[in-house]
């Protein structure tokens, strides 16, 4: 399975939105906690912008989830040793 940057950003954004809504936070409230604009949260949630590792960690902390929550859909690919 190949993951494109846009599908990755969209998946992470959907997870942010899902957890934010579960916690009954508005985009503005989450943005205030992260010290960014609500427009930036909106862009993350729509997959229009990607998040840096720092921003993902920051959002995860405020949403009270482990950063792994945002990546659990990704398949684990095992590299095979070519000398086997």
Residue positions per predicted region:
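DNA major-groove recognition helix of helix-turn-helix/homeodomain DNA-binding modules
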Residues: 54-69
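Short basic helix-loop element that most often maps to the first helix and adjoining turn
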Residues: 14-29, 58
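Short, conserved catalytic or interaction motifs in soluble domains
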Residues: 46
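Short alpha-helical DNA-recognition segment
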Residues: 24-43
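A detector for short, charged/polar N-terminal pre-domain segments
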Residues: 1-11
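Short, charged recognition helix plus adjacent turn
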Residues: 71-84
